[in-house]
Design a protein with these regions (language model features):
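A structural signal for short hydrophobic beta-strand segments in well-ordered beta-sheet cores
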Residues: 16-17
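C-terminal structural segments of small proteins and small subunits
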Residues: 42-75
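A generic structural signal for short beta-strands and their flanking turns/coil linkers
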Residues: 1-3, 20-24, 52-54, 65-67
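Compact, glycine-rich, soluble single-domain proteins
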Residues: 6, 11, 21-22, 26-35, ...
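Short, Lys/Arg-enriched charge-dense amphipathic segments
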Residues: 4-8, 57-58
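Residue-level marker for the onset of beta-strands and adjacent loop->beta junctions
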Residues: 1, 12-13
Length: 75
């Protein structure tokens, strides 16, 4: 399954919201330095979809707040 994600780094609280267009908004407390925010988003997605880390693949947007992920396996 492919999903679109908008990342909000440096947030006070970690949370996830889905808007009316089906885009997932992920709020993480980590800064967008050296991939820390990306790793935090991947960690959040693994918990949300109850899957393993290797099943969450970043397709595009490694340096952008707008990202595309692919979730493999059953969820």
């Amino acid at each position: 399954m492919k999903i679109k994600v908008v990342v909000h780094p440096n947030s006070k609280k970690k949370r996830m919201d889905k808007d009316l267009l089906g885009i997932l908004h992920v709020y993480v407390s980590e800064p967008p330095l050296k991939g820390r925010a990306n790793m935090a988003v991947i960690e959040s997605l693994t918990k949300y979809f109850k899957t393993k880390r290797r099943n969450v693949i970043l397709l595009s947007g490694s340096k952008s707040k707008n990202k595309a992920f692919e979730i493999l396996g059953s969820y």
